[in-house]
């Protein structure tokens, strides 16, 4: 997908001024998708759509559906596209064997603290091995979280965002934090722990997995609102990046019913690979609505609004 025009960096964020460099917090939210992109009548308005000031937002193509989270990480962090790899492989586990270029490595070279965090097992997708190779000085996992605010059996987005705020408050240098959430992970079969999260979908009855998923996304939105409210009040410059890794693997009949027909053409199937994203700043920056881009291009938007000179590879992108 061609990359839409990038906003110019604001004059107040000089490309070479260490003092002006903002902290950058990136959140890849598990299975965060906007089902109303299949049919506006679905009607569940997500929080990101309400962001207008100092916000770049839109949809981005992910290379995966229903799983394969690490490949969405790889695309964002490196700028590389999964289009050039065999279908179904995990780049993390098959190809990264030595230190590799990434956004984390570049920002580390500019003097940033680099932290990657995921409130689940460190062995997942070999993150405990791969993240340091991508330039993350510090990595934290499930055992580093209080685990007092779980939804189902997973650390909630709210607890993770509180953890992120704590790390921000204790940084010694500008912070680049990359967080991968766990709250909305499959499966979506309601049980005693999760029934209270279900949101009745009157137009589409008979899909308890979709009802549970909708409730989880509403919890994500509440947590996201909390996070941005906190950073709105922070005087230091901060960039918040948020995107979904992939569409959830819900009942295919549910998607067919929402869309109104089978997903037959390539263009129609791509609808299940479009995830929301936004890049928000707590300082003045140009707002842009992006109809469609790809996850591997998102770092360019981040560098621009942060006032950081694009690395050579990103200039090629």
Where are the predicted features?
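Solvent-exposed soluble domains appended to multi-pass membrane proteins
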Residues: 5-22, 26-29, 34-317
């Amino acid at each position: 997908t061609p990359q839409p025009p990038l906003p110019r960096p604001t004059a107040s964020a000089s490309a070479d001024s260490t003092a002006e460099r903002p902290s950058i917090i990136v959140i890849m939210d598990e299975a965060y998708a906007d089902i109303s992109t299949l049919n506006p009548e679905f009607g569940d308005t997500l929080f990101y759509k309400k962001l207008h000031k100092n916000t770049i937002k839109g949809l981005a193509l992910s290379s995966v559906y229903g799983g394969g989270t690490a490949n969405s990480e790889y695309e964002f962090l490196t700028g590389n596209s999964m289009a050039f790899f065999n279908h179904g492989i995990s780049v993390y586990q098959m190809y990264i064997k030595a230190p590799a270029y990434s956004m984390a490595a570049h920002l580390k070279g500019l003097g940033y603290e680099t932290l990657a965090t995921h409130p689940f097992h460190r062995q997942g997708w070999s993150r405990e091995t791969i993240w340091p190779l991508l330039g993350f000085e510090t990595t934290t996992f499930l055992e580093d979280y209080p685990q007092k605010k779980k939804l189902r059996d997973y650390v909630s987005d709210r607890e993770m965002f509180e953890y992120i705020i704590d790390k921000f408050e204790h940084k010694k240098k500008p912070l680049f934090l990359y967080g991968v959430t766990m709250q909305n992970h499959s499966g979506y079969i309601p049980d005693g722990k999760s029934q209270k999260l279900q949101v009745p979908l009157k137009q589409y009855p008979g899909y308890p997995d979709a009802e549970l998923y909708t409730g989880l996304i509403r919890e994500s939105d509440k947590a996201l609102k909390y996070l941005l409210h906190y950073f709105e009040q922070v005087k230091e410059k901060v960039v918040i990046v948020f995107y979904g890794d992939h569409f959830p693997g819900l009942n295919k009949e549910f998607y067919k019913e929402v869309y109104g027909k089978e997903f037959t053409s390539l263009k129609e199937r791509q609808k299940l690979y479009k995830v929301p994203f936004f890049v928000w700043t707590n300082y003045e920056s140009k707002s842009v609505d992006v109809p469609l881009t790809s996850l591997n291009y998102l770092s360019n938007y981040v560098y621009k609004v942060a006032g950081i000179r694009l690395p050579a590879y990103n200039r090629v992108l």
